[in-house]
Curated annotation (Swiss-Prot):
Provenance organism: Homo sapiens
Ranges per topology, Vesicular: 117-118
Name listed for the protein in its UniProt record: Vesicle-associated membrane protein 1
PROSITE patterns with a match to the protein in the record: SYNAPTOBREVIN, V_SNARE
Organismal lineage: Eukaryota, Metazoa, Chordata, Craniata, Vertebrata
Tree of life domain: Eukaryota
Record GO biological process: SNARE complex assembly; vesicle fusion
Gene that encodes it: VAMP1
Amino acid sequence: MSAPAQPPAEGTEGTAPGGGPPGPPPNMTSNRRLQQTQAQVEEVVDIIRVNVDKVLERDQKLSELDDRADALQAGASQFESSAAKLKRKYWWKNCKMMIMLGAICAIIVVVIVIYFFT
């Protein structure tokens, strides 16, 4: 008849099939995976927090930039209107000077004509 089954040798209870080194118990593997996943989740949450902070900071800077752009636009409009007024003012001054110069030249011509023809 056949020989009775031999009990396993001492120290071989946790060994992997094939006689390799013993593997961790299944409970330890799932705990390690859970810890790794939690660490990854915490890392992603930290990255998201940083990104949200950056977005809020960027929004604030854009708001400030928009306010400055509005103020600059208002200043540019005011400058444009005052420059147009100044241009008109000096155009009229120039016209007056030309009229005065023409009148003076006309008077000089009249004086010369009267002096030579009388």
